[in-house]
C-alpha cells in the first residue's frame, strides 16, 4: 500500500518560539506561512510541520497517496477510519485513522500533489 510521503505535524502554542527552537537544531524554514500560523521546516531529509491553532493534536500526515485506495485497502484489512475519505472545500481528499494507541494518522492529498507524487515519488526536494 503506497501511503505517500509522511510528515510529523506538531500542534504548538507559540509558533515563533517553536521555529526558533528548531532552528537551533539546524532546521530551516522551507514553507513560511507564519502569517497563517503554520510553517514547514526541514532538517536533512525530514520535513516537520508546525501548526498554531490549526490542529488539535500531534499527528502524522501522509500526502501524495490515493486517499480512496488507501481507505479501501486498509478497510479490507480490518482497519476502521474515524473520518472516511471526503473531498475537502480546498479540493483535497482526506481521511483519518487512529493507531492502537490513539495516535492520529491523517491522509490528505491535493490533485496536483497526487500527479507530482506519481511522476517523481516525492513532494519535497531535500
Q: Whereabouts are the PLM-identified features?
A:
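N-terminal beta-strand motif that seeds the catalytic metal site of vicinal oxygen chelate
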Residues: 1-16, 58-60, 110-126
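Short acidic/glycine-enriched loop/turn segments that link adjacent beta-strands
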Residues: 34-37, 56, 88-93
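Active-site beta-strand termini and strand-to-loop segments that position acidic
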Residues: 40-45, 52-53, 97-100, 110
Amino acid at each position: 500500500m503506497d501511503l505517500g510521503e509522511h510528515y510529523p505535524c506538531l500542534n504548538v502554542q507559540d509558533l515563533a518560539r517553536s521555529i526558533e527552537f528548531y532552528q537551533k537544531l539546524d532546521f530551516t524554514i522551507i514553507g513560511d506561512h507564519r502569517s497563517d500560523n503554520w510553517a514547514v521546516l526541514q532538517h536533512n531529509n525530514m520535513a516537520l510541520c508546525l501548526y498554531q491553532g490549526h490542529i488539535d493534536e500531534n499527528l502524522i500526515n501522509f500526502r501524495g497517496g490515493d486517499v480512496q485506495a488507501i481507505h479501501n485497502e486498509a478497510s479490507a484489512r480490518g482497519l476502521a477510519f474515524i473520518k472516511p475519505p471526503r473531498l475537502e472545500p480546498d479540493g483535497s481528499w482526506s481521511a483519518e485513522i487512529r493507531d492502537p494507541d490513539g495516535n492520529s494518522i491523517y491522509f490528505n492529498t491535493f490533485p496536483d500533489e497526487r500527479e507530482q507524487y506519481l511522476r517523481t515519488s516525492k513532494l519535497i526536494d531535500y
